[in-house]
From Swiss-Prot:
Cofactor note: Binds 1 Mg(2+) ion per subunit. Binds 2 Zn(2+) ions per subunit.
Function description: DNA-dependent RNA polymerase catalyzes the transcription of DNA into RNA using the four ribonucleoside triphosphates as substrates.
Subunit structure comment from the entry: The RNAP catalytic core consists of 2 alpha, 1 beta, 1 beta' and 1 omega subunit. When a sigma factor is associated with the core the holoenzyme is formed, which can initiate transcription.
Example GO molecular function: DNA binding
Gene name tied to this protein: rpoC
CDD domains: RNAP_beta'_C, RNAP_beta'_N
Protein residues bound to Zn(2+) 2: 815, 889, 896, 899
Signal sequence residues: none
Record field: catalytic activity: RNA(n) + a ribonucleoside 5'-triphosphate = RNA(n+1) + diphosphate
The entry's keywords: DNA-directed RNA polymerase, Magnesium, Metal-binding, Nucleotidyltransferase, Transcription, Transferase, Zinc
NCBIfam families: rpoC_TIGR
A Gene Ontology cellular-component term: DNA-directed RNA polymerase complex
Name assigned to this protein: DNA-directed RNA polymerase subunit beta'
Amino acid sequence: MAFRKENKTKSNFSKISIGLASPEEILENSSGEVLKPETINYRTYKPERDGLFCERIFGPIKDYECHCGKYKRIRYKGIVCDRCGVEVTEKKVRRERMGHIQLVVPVAHIWYFRSLPNKIGYLLGLPTKKLDSIIYYERYVVIQPGVKAEDGIAEYDLLSEEEYLDILDTLPKDNQYLEDNDPNKFIAKMGAEAIYDLLARLDLDALSYELRHRAGNDASQQRKNEALKRLQVVESFRASRGRNKPEWMIVRIVPVIPPELRPLVPLDGGRFATSDLNDLYRRVIIRNNRLKRLIEIKAPEVILRNEKRMLQESVDSLFDNSRKSSAVKTDANRPLKSLSDSLKGKQGRFRQNLLGKRVDYSARSVIVVGPELKMGECGIPKLMAAELYKPFIIRKLIERGIVKTVKSAKKIVDRKEAVIWDILEHVMKGHPVLLNRAPTLHRLGIQAFQPKMIEGKAIQLHPLACTAFNADFDGDQMAVHLPLSNEAILEAQMLMLQSHNILNPANGAPITVPAQDMVLGLYYITKLRAGAKGEGLTFYGPEEALIAYNEGKVDIHAPVKVIVKDVDENGNIVDVMRETSVGRVIVNEIVPPEAGYINTIISKKSLRDIISDVIKVCGVAKAADFLDGIKNLGYQMAFKGGLSFNLGDIIIPKEKETLVQKGYDEVEQVVNNYNMGFITNNERYNQVIDIWTHVNSELSNILMKTISSDDQGFNSVYMMLDSGARGSKEQIRQLSGMRGLMAKLQKAGAEGGQIIENPILSNFKEGLSVLEYFISTHGARKGLADTALKTADAGYLTRRLVDVSHDVIITEEDCGTLRGLVCTDLKNNDEVIATLYERILGRVSVHDIIHPTTGELLVAGGEEITEEVAKKIQDSPIESVEIRSVLTCEAKKGVCAKCYGRNLATSRMVQKGEAVGVIAAQSIGEPGTQLTLRTFHAGGTAANIAANASIVAKNSARLEFEELRTVDIVDEMGEAAKVVVGRLAEVRFVDVNTGIVLSTHNVPYGSTLYVSDGDLVEKGKLIAKWDPFNAVIITEATGKIEFEGVIENVTYKVESDEATGLREIIIIESKDKTKVPSAHILTEDGDLIRTYNLPVGGHVIIENGQKVKAGEVIVKIPRAVGKAGDITGGLPRVTELFEARNPSNPAVVSEIDGEVTMGKIKRGNREIIVTSKTGEVKKYLVALSKQILVQENDYVRAGTPLSDGATTPADILAIKGPTAVQEYIVNEVQDVYRLQGVKINDKHFEIIVRQMMRKVQIDEPGDTRFLEQQVVDKLEFMEENDRIWGKKVVVDAGDSQNMQPGQIVTARKLRDENSMLKRRDLKPVEVRDAVAATSTQILQGITRAALQTSSFMSAASFQETTKVLNEAAINGKTDKLEGMKENVICGHLIPAGTGQREFEKIIVGSKEEYDRILANKKTVLDYNEVE
């Protein structure tokens, strides 16, 4: 009879460890052995005995009923039937009882020899190919050479059948009768048995020392790496020594999972649907049994070997069918789903069942708008509410004595009798519901509402919640969930209620902003109209003004004077006379008086600021009421205003025809220039595109002027646009201007989208011609396709971000770091992208900040920078502030509140336990989806702003140049000018009086300069201009040109133009690396002055032998302009940065400051040598096809690119250090989002970047337990170095019994030992100081970082499940359940917010319960006192 035990796992465990299962453990957890491949009897539908569904092993199929039916009912619980051997118990044990299969021969576990890195292979030092040939019974392996060692046969040698038999023949007779542990015995085996023996014989410590020695001393880098890889596996086994033995990677007993987890369901028609696992198990059992029989009947070796191989393969398929080249397929040619497959992927155990479960007490329905709802309310259909709150209703029915039993109460609820409705009303009071709209992209995708019962079957949603849910009412559905426990209800009410979530956690701006109709109504009544009825009247107060309006004496738009309540500069409410309108008076009736009098026209933008102010001044509760008032007024006025629009409101400007004609004329001129041969085809194209872009933008401007002055700006279309209710300038332009340039169709794999040079001149009001329509359909369709594809990408980005940062939680108040980031205005050339105010607001200052002129303390170090302080700092001359940042936070786990700063969703300092990592990931991911969904609105219109190609003085100033090298020329107008030939030239505009630098500009190579250093210039003076369409190469000397290596069809091709017959020489990539195209400039006597390399793609515009003057252009390299700028470029860019990928054409970057000299040409690469002042020399190879950006004798700074291309984050990290790369990534990603007009606070990006920089790579392990090149956590690294700090390493143990060479001992132990030896006159122990490890900071992409987390559960549920579990098992890892995902998987509360471990003991209840408990407590106390 199989043995039974009750081993129920407790659910309050605090960690999970994973390891290899030993055969004993598998037996221990098994309830019996499965002997037969049968599943169930096809006639009786009862499980076969000893089969895969056997009731003896796994438990009964029906509750409390044995197989033969002798014992039925619960009273026999626990009895084992004497006839059929089935224990009488409940049927759910079939979900937890395991079985096992005892294999006749051991089998290797596929995870450990088929997945990379090959664990068994690394341990034994055998390559995968050889290992496979042993495991699959093709070769013998020598386990112990014994007497044959002198014949040159060594351990681990592979033998073929013949060789093996030869050796057996030549062995001494008695050899095979020796004991296995006799060193003379020759042993060779094949299959997993052989591997088992080899693994069992390993001495890990000796192997470890040998490999460490090899890794330290081997000259060949490849062998060194090999040794390090093997070391990692060896070290894993040494570290987990108690739990894991290498030979357990060979399976002797296969566990059988419980039958309910691999069900067999009868379908109608006598067929069965079965889980694939049953098939896989059956194959294993059949082959195992056949092998048993064959061994019993002493079958020949060949047959046995074949059968063993088949057994190995069947177990492989069972464990991981997708890894095998020949996966087991079903009849329908579908690979069977093995055990590994059921863990992997979106449908696997982790993501399908552990991280996302379906829940009870939920409902879903279509949503409709509920304009009469208050903030924080929602309408729930009666039927839905009755079903959701059913248990609560039943309880009340019984309490009120309406029914006696639960069953009858249930019936009443199901029949929906009248009595339940008022009970339901009562139950719903103070019991909020959660509404959720998929996709839940950020935390505002689930909010709590107080439900109201409504008729109908649709859920009513508050219109202001739409933005947060990204919902509209075109058929969206939402899910409703009911929080059940007191704790959950409390959290829903306090933390998740809609009216408490007015601010967007991504940027702190209000998210419940009225949109569309509401904005339009408010805009309409706050707009003024000159000449309206009652203009210029004066009223003594708002009441009088309203009476006059109601009596029809004054128009709602008329400018009038009214005495209203406003707030003066000290914040007191005073009565003042304001020039305003009745509409504005009506609006201000709703605005809380503390917020002042709003006397502007209200658009969506200004409304957002007003709401922000109201929240700041009056708090969230008042703000919610204010929002409700605004909503009602907006809807009412949009209705009263009758704001429809008709075709006549779309006005086409009269100037359109002349503008278009002007465009045609200019294009004609450009084409003439081209035909005359003045410009190349590419330039012609760029200029044409430029002309049309200009025409389009000019037309847009005229159109805006026209439409905004129509009917004093009361044109409906203009009102919609201007208020921000609907539509954009783009769309209006296409309706009544011209559609403009469109992107060209793009072939797969071609260069980015070119632009069609004939624009669409019609607009939608005039209608498009067939051709125009056809061109524009392409853009529109591309938009739709992009949207569909990019949504998935954005979702995947969010998933990776959450995975990398889910364990970042605020763990402490202050980590006490002294470091921070220096913040300044973020500028691009001279326009401020982000002001200092925005960047420091809500952060914590590192130092005291003192006003430089007045000397007052603005903010103390370690204090929050509030709005007032930030404003003062912005207005003062202070240019940079050092703030605390999560990038520099030194908290051991998570981050500290001071380094994070203000929680944007509440505008207060962040609290301990806030899950800032997840908030950051959502804040970055959510707009990612928005961005991608935004492509198609412009209908594929090519949005490219005309390239600006000059520097013009913005104000009068003095010029200062840096690194300027020029050549004097005469420009095309005949004026004297200079051409810049230095690559690093910069011009600074300096204020003449104060000497403050106003702005700094880069002066590009090849630009024409019209001023000199130190000049005073007036505002509007042209400083420099350059060719925006071409990069150029300019000669710096006068002389004769001679080409070298310029060979037709080898290094250049000729493109002749059909239209003009002009021929152009274009440099191409040469197959022959010895031929390097270059241009020499020679003197009259033929002496070489300069040489210029000709880069690939350059158009040579000078003939061979031609004379050139200094400053002339010899090569033009067309820049790729006129690409359609889509976020399609944006999302991949964000991914590229977060994954820390190197761009496709990385620039070569100088690592030191120094002087440049050009070296020789080696294999198609030019050598560039940088020599620093200290004499350090660095050599770089730059492919000749690239343009080299430095010249002989230039002085370059570290980090300067030497060739064109993008700088890689890895280079920035290596050269400029961690801070620089962190700022680089944050700013680069911010740029992508800014381009789309999406505001996200820097701190969110900082959290992700912090997670990317968690690890260091060991350079020199010293005496620590690390290996060279190992990647470890920064913290772990510091702890390990602290551990050996001050300790000694034994060099020579002398006569000591207790110490070995290489042992690490404390100074005290050493002193004791040595004094003992000294007393006995023995040789003392010699030591040296322990050497600490050194490391380099590395930057990991978010995917790498997520897979490298300390929690294996989190990593396994992210990606590469099998690989992660595999590694974790070998290392015997323990998961301490510190992050979020691990805890969700284990069904625990997450360790953040109210789930923090210190709140575990708190119980939420009512006052009555508390009093009752206290009363009981008193009686007990009295009882004790009586004693």
